Every structure is written in C-alpha cells, then in structure tokens.
A protein has these predicted regions:
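Intrinsically disordered, low-complexity terminal regions
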Residues: 1-270
C-alpha cells in the first residue's frame, strides 16, 4: 500500500496542472477535478461576465492590470469533463460560461447578457470561478447554486444567484439579487444613472452607502424589520414593513431594497 501511495504521488506531480482525476478514499465512484485558465487585456468600462450553474464565484481587484479567470471543476458522480468552459469575446467585453450537457434537445450556449437560460438535469459537476479584474472593469456574476462575492473592486457590479448569498464590495455602485440567501453590499459610490435594486426572498439585506448619498429610497419586507442610519424624508404613511422616502436631495436616482423573510438595514459609511 505504501509503494502504491508513493507511485500515485509521483504520478500526480508529473501530471499537467490542467487535469487531475483520481479515486478518492472514502467516496463511492470517481471524483474528478479540472482547472481552466484564461487571461486577457480589458479596458476601463468593459465588462467581464461569469455565468455558472453550480458553484461559487469570487472576484477581486487584479494586481497586474490584467483580467484573469480560474475555473475549477469538481465532479463526483459525473465527470468534470462533461462541463465545458467557453469564452465569448464581444464588443462590450468578455463572457465566460460553464456550459453543461443539454438534455432538452436545445443545446446550451454561452451568450452575453441575460440571454436564454441553460437547461441542466442530473449533473453534479460544480464549477468555482476565481476572477481578478483590472481597475474600472465592470463585473457581472451569475450562478444558480452558489455564492457570488466581490472584494474591493473599483467598477460597477451586478451579482445574481438563486441559492446562495450575495456579498459585494466595490468603490463604484452595484446591484444584485438572490432567492434563498442574504445580500450584503458596501458601495463606494451612489452616482448610479437611474436605479439600483437589491432583493431576496429568504434572507436579509444589509447595504452600506457613502455618507453623502442622495437618492429616492424604498424598502419593503414582510417578515422582518427596516432600519436606516440616514435621515429620511418619508413619503406617505410610515410603516415598519415598508418605507418610501428621500435621502439627501434625491438626485434623480432610485434605490430599492426588497425581501420577504428577512430584515433590511441601510448603513452610512464612516
């Protein structure tokens, strides 16, 4: 057994980094893992979009001025090779997708923007994305079963999932939503052009804005409370479950925070 373990260790060391498949002790069947790397130049104002189904997405600021993406695929009952990572370059930037096998007859495609949803059935492969962005690049992260998190970005952020938390930190502005999870966001700018929205169904919302924020504000919950650090000029009837009013001068912009089962907290940055 010791000799076999040594042989296995040497084999793993000599394997290319891109693909490693092995039989994991304590698990039934094969566990496979595979990595995908991409990097490229992206200018200020361009968008890097990540689309996944199962797995987490994490984005942070790049230290070398280049955009970099590491996608790590994990398979248990299904081979990680069954999920393809596709890169689509377009006029607005780059979209990178985890493309699962299709079972409905309509092939899954990697399309920029909202596009058509992918159909996935009975495939347990998860793909975790680790992203590094140059300053000023817009980030879009979309998944279904997983968390979307950004750390100290400097561009606009849009983050969406279904089953997972949203955690956003950017010196710009952002918006995001989930269904089963909480939303936590810290924004360094309130100069969004029209409106931004953060929403969930089963989870709380905590949003931090600059002290000088100026916006129309609306917050709504069913089972929870609403609190704000900002002085608020209330419009209409004041309710513990629904608040509509103005922060600062309003600025011609809108901010909507909405949940069903959870509380809402609007914080003022110090």
């Amino acid at each position: 057994m010791r000799k076999l373990s040594l042989i296995l260790m040497v084999w793993l060391i000599l394997m290319p980094v891109a693909t490693v498949s092995l039989l994991a002790a304590g698990h039934l069947g094969f566990v496979s893992q595979e990595e995908f790397h991409w990097q490229g130049e992206m200018g200020v104002g361009k968008t890097l979009e990540i689309k996944g189904i199962n797995g987490n997405i994490h984005a942070e600021l790049s230290s070398n001025g280049r955009a970099e993406v590491l996608a790590t695929k994990h398979g248990h009952r299904h081979d990680s090779k069954s999920v393809e990572i596709r890169v689509v370059e377009h006029g607005n930037g780059v979209t990178i997708c985890a493309v699962y096998p299709s079972v409905s007859g309509r092939p899954n495609e990697c399309v920029a923007g909202d596009g058509e949803g992918m159909n996935v059935h009975n495939n347990d492969v998860s793909v975790d994305f680790a992203v590094r962005l140059p300053a000023g690049v817009r980030f879009v992260g979309r998944t279904v079963n997983g968390q979307v998190q950004t750390s100290a970005l400097s561009g606009e952020v849009a983050a969406n999932t279904v089953n997972g938390n949203i955690l956003i930190s950017t010196s710009s502005y952002a918006q995001g939503g989930t269904v089963n999870g909480s939303v936590t966001a810290s924004l360094g700018s309130f100069n969004w052009p029209h409106s931004v929205e953060f929403e969930t169904v089963n989870g709380s919302i905590t949003l931090e804005l600059p002290a000088a924020a100026s916006t129309q504000f609306e917050a709504e919950t069913v089972n929870g409370n609403i609190s704000t650090d900002f002085p608020l000029t209330v419009q209409g009837k004041l309710s513990p479950k629904h608040i509509s009013g103005t922060i600062g001068g309003g600025g011609g912009r809108q901010l909507l925070l909405k949940t069903v089962n959870g509380s809402i907290e609007l914080r003022r940055a110090h």
